[in-house]
Amino acid sequence: MIDPSSVVGKAPPIERRVPFVVVGAGAAGVAAALEAVRAGVEVMLIDENPLDPDLMAMDVPHYFGQRMSLSARNRALMLERVIEANPGLGRADEAGVDVQLGVSVWGAFRNGPTQRELAGPVLGLANEERSWLVRYDRLLIATGTRDVVLGFPGWQKAGVVGANGLASLTRHRVFAGRQLAVLGSGPLGLQTARQALEAGLEVVAVVEVTAELRGDPVETRRLADQGVRFYPSHTVQEASGRTGEVESVTLIRLDADLAPIAGSETEIACDTICLALGLAPNVELLALLGATLRFRSDLGGFVPETDGWLGTSAPGVFAAGDCTGVHEALVADDGVARGQGRLAGLGAALSLGAVDRARAEAVRTELGGVGARPSEPVHAYWRHWLRSSIRVGGLEVYACQCEEVTRRELIGVQPPRYLGWHSAGMSARGLGTLLRDGPINQDQIKRLTRAGMGPCQGRRCREQVALFLAEEAGVPVGQIPLPSFRAPVRPLSLQVLWPRDEPEAARDHWVSWFGIPTQFTPHWTSHVDASETTVFMGLGGESQHGGSSVEKQRELPGTGRG
């Protein structure tokens, strides 16, 4: 007997099949695409720049902090600047690579224990107008990094940005600020300050929570000679501004225990505060594909396990560049990322039979060790920043901006106040009681507090939520698992996701596909006409749409309920 409501055989059409798809046109992605295409492999190179300004407004994929100028909405101008800022795109295009700009990868799918209907592994792609599926034989993930964001009083104001967000805006000449305070004095912080000066910005402060500055002393002196003032043993007391935008930052000195020293406040005029405390590898697509990830604090967090060709445990999937680990070498020099890209591109070509093994091995030997080079662990440093911010700013600071979840609500495992919901039972619980129930994880906290459930999809709060959980549990942050990732991994409008007319199968079987209770009624015992069935799931016999369920709910075949 055939179940007409089954989804098997009803998948959306696959528009194209490509032997090798590269996601991310940074140093690693471009190098991989060039290596493979020169071996005779058909290559598609995907990059989401120029970004949809609506995504930028949601701080996706970087923390832009509403500091984009109006030029960011001029797509033709932005396309020109993206190509100008990345000469590798032109080289790839001339070499025969199919370069897809302004395209986001919102999903990655392959057959597995719970999914068997796909013809092969596919990517979900989208631009501002439409969405489509592309099948691949080999895939390289070169998606780079995310900004690590740790909050402070006033961090929800426009003008608080991340190092990646600032770098993207200045590189494409759409940054709408002038005076910049940088948080963090390590290689990333110093590089951010240097690039800001080169872009014609004024760097009014570099702030460091530790007593010792962390970056290269030579570069530190150079910046100081150019008028940059450094503030060791300081943290942010508050970002201030009367119009919802940053107008100044107040710093406060810390003692050896990271406690604030009363009367040591310093207010500095600025319109932008840049978080340059660190970066985290972008592993969402790798997680979707089931690649094995392991925690490495010296590489920025969870990173993929790779073999000698930078292949992952997911069949046919490679990883290269910053998404395999962030360390000092990659911050200072993208040559490491380029080497990784070449190696991964060569590995993909070899696995496709496009290059003989002897030649591939020779090139790999020439490249030498291009894997991630360990540096010092970073999470202890981030914990210093978080602890100092809690001591200075307290628990009424947002831990999650999108859902307006405060630190107090996170620790108390309470939903955000805007919901107007209270439960005496839940009020008696908190992280402490959850810990007694078993290992804690971010998915659990997301469901109970909504932290990480907003449109930025946890990009602004993921690390600080993990740090909070580790602090409360008294465990290393590496024991806090990553949250689950599900498609779409980019905010996506329904109009873009499915612009076509609703197919007949969806019209006939939406009751089953959308998880309505009657899906459990066997299809051979009754047929539910979706157009004639209204389902109400309110509690206590009350319809969710007002009135009583007796008045509005039709009898559902096979349930015995009226």
Range-by-range predicted roles:
Residues 2-448, 453-455, 459-468, 472-498, ...:
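Residues forming the flavin
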Residues 425, 461-463, 471, 490-495, ...:
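Accessory DNA-binding and partner-docking regions appended to nucleic-acid-acting proteins
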